[in-house]
Amino acid sequence: SYIKGKVVAAALQNKSGEFLKPSVAAGAKALNGISLDKDLAGKNPNPTAKGAYPIATLTWVLAYKTGNGDNAKVVQDAFNYMLSDAAQNKAPSLGFVPLKGDILAKSKAAVNKIGK
């Protein structure tokens, strides 16, 4: 999430030379521009896109492909909700960046691999 309330955030310079304060829009430019590999690891922690905030990161959650037993469906349901349109549409009001495009698609595919 980004800074709210009476705290003043510093504007940081990104690789495009812009000075930006943290916001959902600037975070979205950064996070949704990350290219993920098959293990959902990104390679560019300092985005080059115009309008992208230079310090942004994803929240990582580890889940097992096997060994979940009877909890597998509950775990999948929880992650599927987090990645749903309903949850992603709430993200900005909570100070988080909604996931879109490749990151969202790869995250949903990873959830489908969670098994018993």
PLM feature spans:
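Flexible, solvent-exposed loop/hinge segments that line or gate ligand/substrate-binding clefts
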Residues: 1-85, 94-116
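Bilobed periplasmic-binding protein-like "clamshell/Venus-flytrap" ligand-binding domains
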Residues: 91
